[in-house]
UniProtKB/Swiss-Prot annotation:
Entry's Gene Ontology molecular function annotations: toxin activity
Tissue: Plasma.
The family this protein is said to belong to: Belongs to the bradykinin-related peptide family.
Function in brief: Induces smooth muscle dilation and contraction. Intra-arterial injection induces a significant decrease in ventral aortic blood pressure of between 5 and 10 minutes duration followed by a dose dependent increase in ventral aortic blood pressure of between 30 and 60 minutes duration. May target bradykinin receptors (BDKRB).
Organism annotation: Amia calva
Keyword set, alphabetical order: G-protein coupled receptor impairing toxin, Secreted, Toxin, Vasoactive, Vasoconstrictor, Vasodilator
UniProt-recorded name of the protein: [Trp5]-bradykinin
Subcellular localization: Secreted
Location (main, coarse): secreted
GO biological process: negative regulation of blood pressure; negative regulation of smooth muscle contraction; positive regulation of blood pressure; positive regulation of smooth muscle contraction; vasoconstriction; vasodilation
Cellular component annotations (GO), alphabetically ordered: extracellular space
KW Secreted (keyword) present: yes
């Protein structure tokens, strides 16, 4: 997972 990833988006 890359930095700044969002599990909600």
């Amino acid at each position: 997972r890359p930095p700044g990833w969002s599990p909600f988006r």
